[in-house]
Each structure stands twice: as C-alpha cells, then as structure tokens.
Design a protein with these regions (language model features):
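Alpha-helical transmembrane segments of multi-pass membrane proteins
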Residues: 1-320
Length: 320
C-alpha cells in the first residue's frame, strides 16, 4: 500500500511540475530525453547504494508507534521510488503533447498514449513476474529496465533534429556501445550484501552457509556465534529479516509445536504443518511412530530448499 501511495504521489508531483515545462520555451523532446536518462541512471545508481537508500531491517509490525512505522515505510518507499515516478509523471503529459501536435488532436493523442501505457503496464507486470524475476533475478531485472530507459533516450535522440543526421548516427552508435560495455561490466552481486543483514546489522559473509534469490524472497542461512554452548546454532534470514533459527531456545518451542498437538490426538496419522521455516516442526512431527504422512506448506520454495542446511536439527525432514 505504501509503495502504491508513493508511486501515485510521484506521478501527481510530476504532472504538476511539467506545467512549468509547458510554459517555458524548452524543447519537449530534449526534456523527455533527460527524463528517460534520469530514470535509467537512478535505477542503476540504486543498485550500488541500496543499503544507503533503505533503512536497516526492523520489526515492521510494531503497532505501538504507528506514526514511526508509517514514516519509516514512507521514507524507504520514497527513497527507492519517488524520483523515478516524478520523472514518469512528467513524461506522460509531454508524450501526449508531442503526439497530439496541437489542441485539436489532444483527444487522439491522449487515447493513444493512455492505451499504450495501460497495455505496457499489463504486459510489463506479466513479463516481470513470470519471466524476468524467475530467470534473471532482481538485480538483472532492474538493470534490464534501466537499459530500456536508456535505449529509449537513444531512440529519442536519434529521431530528433539535433546536429546533423550523420553525427546523430555516430553518437547513437557510441552511446549503444557504452551501454553495452557498462552492462557487461556490472558486478552480479550488488544486492547480495543488502540481503545479508538483519536487525542486528551486517552479517559475516564468512559464516554464510546458504544463499538463494528466489521468486518471492531472498534467503540466507548463517552460522550463529553462540560458542561452545551451542556450536550448531544457525539463523534463517529472508529479505534481510531474521525469520527463524536453530538454537537451544528456538528448537525447543518449534519441536513442541508438533509434539503437543500430536500427543493430544488418539490416532494422529496425517499432519499438516503450515510454514516450513527451518523444518524443525515438520521433522518433529515425522518421528512419531503413529504418524504416516506429514505435509508442510510454505509460500517460499527457497526457504524449503534451505531446509537441507538444518538437516541435523530437523531430522532430515526433506529426505524423510
């Protein structure tokens, strides 16, 4: 809800700001080129500065301080989205005016741009959700979107009346080469450090046992530093938030979640465990001799696959 709110605020602000552009003598194509470049470069810059843009992970369900919760969500969403959405809000009216060519055709121009925008929003959501994110991951998907903005900037420049036609062609080729080289030289792990942290701060990468960027979340498992008292302690971190753990305290209640209900049933043959987590509840249910089948459901396939790291604590639940 907050991200949608910030998105709409950005679009609205951009629509107000573009009025000043219309009242000036600025070249609309030039302004649109700059806006497309700004969107692309901001997205690329955010990949390098995600830890600075977003606050450290925290408990977002603290309802005792609703104003603080609201302001923190708003600040994070604004840092990530506000400037690009302002640029998008300015681009839409500029495109309408460029396509219309005059007040007498404003209806046609608005319909064409609005139709293309709606179609693009639907197609973009489908392609991103079902193709880009599963196949490319978050970083490469964002980089691809930023590249599309930069390519649109190139197209607008190439089809404009800047300089001579030959010079425009040469500059377009150079820009395309620069974009290609930059894309090829991008590190593939820019967002890894962002997800390798929780509310206690940055985690030690030397203690990383498992890492996977999945469709719905990014999962990391770290070895906890509890010393000789608990040498096998581990922590499950999803999207930068510590969600579960294997240690003396956590393991006791997680296994009790299975043992107590099963002991209260006369003939417990089938068990359903909602949320897999570290798999300790699922594994504990499976050790009961009367239980014939245990089903565990979880929204995250990455969390389930990480369960192998906890096999010594969850009774090897995934291979039982």
């Amino acid at each position: 809800s907050m991200m949608l709110g910030v998105f709409l605020i950005g679009i609205s602000l951009g629509s107000f700001l573009v009025v000043a552009v219309f009242r000036s003598s600025l070249n609309l194509r030039t302004v649109l080129i700059l806006l497309q470049a700004a969107i692309g470069l901001y997205v690329i810059g955010s990949l390098y500065n995600m830890e600075q843009l977003l606050s450290t992970p925290w408990n977002g369900y603290n309802l005792q301080k609703p104003v603080f919760v609201f302001s923190r969500y708003f600040a994070d969403s604004s840092a990530l989205m506000l400037l690009p959405t302002i640029a998008l809000g300015m681009s839409f009216p500029i495109l309408i005016k460029m396509i219309s060519g005059g007040h007498e055709h404003v209806g046609i121009g608005t319909g064409q741009i609005y139709g293309a925008n709606t179609f693009g929003a639907i197609l973009g959501s489908l392609i991103t959700g079902f193709l880009f994110l599963p196949r490319l991951g978050v970083q490469q998907s964002l980089l691809l979107v930023a590249t599309l903005n930069l390519l649109m900037m190139m197209y607008l420049f190439r089809t404009g009346d800047y300089f001579t036609k030959t010079l425009r062609k040469m500059m377009t080729v150079v820009l395309a080469g620069v974009i290609l080289v930059v894309n090829m030289g991008f590190p593939s792990d820019l967002l890894d450090r962002f997800f390798m942290r929780d509310s206690t701060g940055q985690k030690d990468i030397r203690k990383l046992l498992y890492f996977e960027e999945g469709l719905t979340d990014t999962v990391a498992v770290f070895k906890d530093n509890y010393g000789a008292l608990d040498p096998d302690a581990k922590r499950l971190v999803t999207n930068g938030v510590s969600m579960s753990a294997v240690n003396f305290i956590a393991s006791r209640y997680m296994k009790l979640l299975a043992h107590l209900p099963i002991m209260l049933v006369d003939n417990p043959e089938e068990v359903l465990v909602v949320c897999f987590g570290t798999g300790q509840t699922t594994g504990a249910a499976a050790v009961h001799p009367k239980v014939k089948a245990v089903d565990s459901v979880d929204l995250s396939g990455s969390v389930v696959r990480a369960g192998n790291v906890f096999s010594s604590q969850n009774y090897n639940a995934l291979k039982n």
